[in-house]
Each structure stands twice: as structure tokens, then as C-alpha cells.
Regions:
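The feature captures the conserved acid-bearing segment of alpha/beta-hydrolase catalytic domains
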Residues: 133-135, 140, 146-154, 164-206
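Primarily recognizes the serine-hydrolase "nucleophile elbow" in alpha/beta-hydrolase
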Residues: 91-155
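Short amphipathic alpha-helix adjacent to the substrate-entry channel of hydrolases
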Residues: 46-64
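The serine-hydrolase catalytic nucleophile loop
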Residues: 43-52, 76, 202-203
Length: 261
């Protein structure tokens, strides 16, 4: 595995808006997976060594993104940073890593807060459009344990009870409001666990059923349920048979299925 570290994607925030690349050794045509870390929009960072399995075991390149968080940031700064990072990374790969097929094999995903951010980029087109992209410029999205309603720390910013279920412009599910053309829906892989945060499995099911209600092409959408795991437990859990992280196995299977079509 090769690395390119500490690349600034927003010069106005050089201490925070950084991305690390984890690349396969072989410079052959490969997918690129942009990963947004978790931490409740107030913690966490781009240093996610469990993602090493993707380039080392599956030949999938990874760009691990750090973004502004509370208390310095406010809604929707972190969504805007995420969109800026995707556009920057796509252009950076075109110019510096031309063997990565970002035209046909570009994936975006995240876990927990990062799953919320990936959902916002997937369903709320205005964020990527600001940077000259649209959600379908991304081949597929991996939403791992994200909150499809207003994120609990955005509720806290508003002075509200963080347990409230609210749906407005800060909720990914808000934007599921029409029946799309199948070609306008990117592939999706949605992950959640049995012992997730209270109400997270139910909200995940609501997201899935709302897409079905609006006649999304459900054959393009996968759901993965992890019995026995807590919130994002599949990130650090490894398969005892081969020692590969469960999240990476799931992500790689999804990416390989989509790119083989």
C-alpha cells in the first residue's frame, strides 16, 4: 500500500480540511472510495487504519477525509466541506492519479456522522452542485449507521432535545420527495446494526421504505443488517476466518458488484 498524506482540499482551512490517500501498490485501473469519518460531528478524524484492508486486500483506493466540526463549525459547514472534498478529490485524482477511474468508479461513504454526511450528499443535490457536480457523478454511496433525520447534534445546536425526530432541510430523508428516473439514482449500500443507537435502526428502515414508497429503483439499493453489533461495531470487527474488517468486506463486495456491471 502507498500513501499520500495531509493533502489540503480547502486552502482557507488548512489545519482541518485534509485528506489522506491509501492506494494499492499496483497503478492499475481501480475504484476510489471517499470516506467520511464518524464522531457525532464533533469528534473523530481521517486517521482510519481499518480502511487499509481496501487497498491491500481488494485493490480499492481510499481517500479519508477530515472536515470542520463542532464547536468551530455550524450546520451545514460540515456538509459543505464534505461536498468540497468530493469535488477536490475527483479533480486531484484526474490530475495526479489518472489510473483511478473516477469517471465510472467513484464511491462516497461514511460511518455514523459520516453516514449522515454521505446521505446529505446523496439526497440533497445543492451541496455537490455548488462545486460543479451532481449526486449521480458518484457511482455509489455507502451509508453506514447514518441518521436520515436531523442529526442529533444539529438539534443540540438549535437548543432542542437531541432525542427529537425532526425532518427538514437538514435531514437527508427530506429530499426524498418525488419519483426519480432510475438513471438519476446512484447505487446505495445502507448498513445498520442490531444494537445501534436507540431509534437508528427504525429510522434506517424509514429511509429505505420511503425510497420504496417513491418508487426508487430498489434493485440499486442494498441493505445490510449486522446482528449482535452495537453502533458501528462492524468498523473494527474482523472476520475470524481471514482477519479482514467486516465493514471493508461489505464495502468491497458492494463496490465490486457495482463496477462489474
Amino acid at each position: 500500500m502507498k500513501t499520500i498524506l495531509n493533502v489540503v482540499y480547502r486552502p482557507e482551512y488548512p489545519e482541518t480540511c485534509l485528506v489522506d490517500f491509501y492506494l494499492p501498490d499496483a497503478e492499475a485501473s481501480a475504484p476510489l472510495f471517499i470516506y467520511l469519518h464518524g464522531g457525532g460531528l464533533e469528534a473523530g478524524n481521517r486517521h482510519c487504519d481499518f480502511l487499509y484492508d481496501l487497498p491491500e486486500k481488494y485493490g480499492i483506493a481510499v481517500a479519508s477525509v477530515e472536515y470542520r466540526m463542532y464547536p468551530e463549525a455550524h450546520d451545514p459547514d460540515f456538509v459543505d466541506d464534505s461536498a468540497a472534498s468530493v469535488a477536490f478529490i475527483r479533480n486531484y485524482a484526474r490530475e495526479n492519479l489518472p489510473y483511478l477511474d473516477v469517471e465510472h468508479m467513484l464511491f462516497v461513504g461514511g460511518s455514523s456522522a459520516g453516514g449522515y454526511l454521505s446521505m446529505m450528499l446523496c439526497f440533497a443535490p445543492q451541496y455537490l452542485e455548488k462545486y460543479g457536480m451532481k449526486p449521480t457523478d458518484v457511482t455509489g454511496y455507502i451509508h453506514d449507521a447514518g441518521q436520515p433525520t436531523v442529526h442529533f447534534n444539529i438539534l443540540r445546536e438549535r437548543g432542542q432535545d437531541t432525542r427529537l425526530v425532526r425532518i427538514d432541510e437538514s435531514a437527508p430523508i427530506w429530499y426524498i420527495d418525488h419519483t426519480p428516473e432510475p438513471a438519476d439514482v446512484p447505487h446505495m449500500c445502507i448498513l445498520y446494526s442490531e444494537n445501534d443507537i436507540t431509534n437508528r435502526p427504525e429510522q434506517t428502515a424509514l429511509l429505505y421504505r420511503t425510497m420504496a414508497h417513491f418508487e426508487y429503483p430498489m434493485e440499486k439499493i442494498e441493505m445490510h443488517y449486522f446482528p449482535g453489533y452495537g453502533h458501528c461495531g462492524q468498523l473494527l470487527a474482523v472476520d475470524p476466518e481471514d482477519g479482514i474488517h467486516v465493514f471493508c468486506k461489505t464495502a468491497a463486495a458492494f463496490i465490486n458488484t457495482v463496477t462489474s456491471h
